[in-house]
């Protein structure tokens, strides 16, 4: 579980809008999914090199396109998602 207060603080650094508890919960869920996917890909990278330790380079080597597709799937999973979260996900994918 990601600390909701930290996620909300980060969100507030990027907007003057009010942020509902539901929006924070939804973004926390999405970020946890992104962490899960990234970890799985990093594990595969480490395994290919015969290691049992995930290193920073394994994270850096994660397939940007795979992550981008998953983030877009998450952002499209509901029409009820607050626009702010959709915009934040768009920013994340544009940085990949």
From Swiss-Prot:
Residues 52-55 are annotated as: Interaction with DNA. Keywords: Chromosome, Cytoplasm, DNA-binding. It is found in: Cytoplasm; Chromosome. Coiled coil: none annotated. One of its GO terms (cellular component) is chromosome. One of its GO terms (molecular function) is protein heterodimerization activity. The record marks 12 as: Interaction with DNA. Belongs to the archaeal histone HMF family. Homodimer. Dimers then assemble into higher oligomers, with the DNA wrapped around the protein core. Binds and compact DNA (95 to 150 base pairs) to form nucleosome-like structures that contain positive DNA supercoils. Increases the resistance of DNA to thermal denaturation (in vitro). This is DNA-binding protein HmvA. The gene is hmvA.
